[in-house]
């Protein structure tokens, strides 16, 4: 009888300890960042060799804790939004006002979606994506942008940009920017279809591309 009672007590204690153990909640990334600085790079008719004569701008936006150091690397904590191919009309050289849609069409007022590209057995992101530089570097990651829109309105030297994207993990990505947006002319320095410079230390999650 004593052994039976002892078994009941041990079982009750085990069940109580199990009830108290809760799984760790999923890590939450900032899906509505405020970008405080950025720039646009103009590449002209970058895809003219492929029959698309629309001009292309690459747009980079950063949260205020990210910066570029003396050797040209991105350092700090925060979010980095990169839109590699923003298509504009052949007559435009600055980012015009309007709503831009994530699309593969290559038409004006579209942005190429984020995808995986494989070169020499290495997987790289192309198109539209956001990089998260977290305090815990093990949480730092990159997410592709696969749908949604971006709206840009210019007031003098200030651009107001609002994002309403969908990421490859099905989550929404908002975000806003309101500041001066310098435009850098790369059309002469970068031949059509040539590789464009990126930050060398952009990381990829271990399972990226799988």
Tell me the role of every PLM-derived stretch.
Residues 23-26, 146-147, 162-210:
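Edge beta-strand at a domain terminus
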């Amino acid at each position: 009888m004593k052994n039976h009672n002892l078994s009941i007590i041990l079982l009750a204690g085990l069940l109580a300890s199990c009830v108290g153990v809760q799984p760790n909640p999923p890590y939450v990334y900032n899906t509505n960042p405020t970008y405080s600085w950025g720039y646009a790079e103009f590449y002209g008719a970058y895809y003219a060799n492929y029959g698309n004569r629309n001009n292309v701008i690459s747009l980079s936006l950063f949260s205020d804790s990210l910066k570029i150091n003396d050797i040209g690397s991105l350092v700090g904590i925060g979010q980095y939004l990169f839109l590699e191919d923003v298509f504009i009309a052949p007559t435009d050289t600055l980012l015009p006002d309007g709503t831009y849609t994530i699309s593969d069409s290559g038409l004006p007022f579209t942005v190429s979606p984020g995808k995986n590209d494989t070169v020499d057995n290495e997987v790289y992101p192309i198109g539209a994506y956001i990089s998260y530089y977290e305090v815990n570097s093990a949480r730092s990651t990159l997410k592709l942008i696969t749908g949604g829109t971006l709206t840009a309105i210019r007031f003098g030297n200030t651009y107001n940009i609002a994002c309403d994207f969908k990421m490859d993990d099905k989550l929404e990505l908002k975000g806003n920017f309101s500041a001066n947006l310098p435009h850098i002319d790369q059309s002469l320095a970068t031949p059509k279809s040539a590789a464009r410079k990126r930050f060398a230390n952009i990381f990829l999650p271990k399972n990226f591309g799988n």
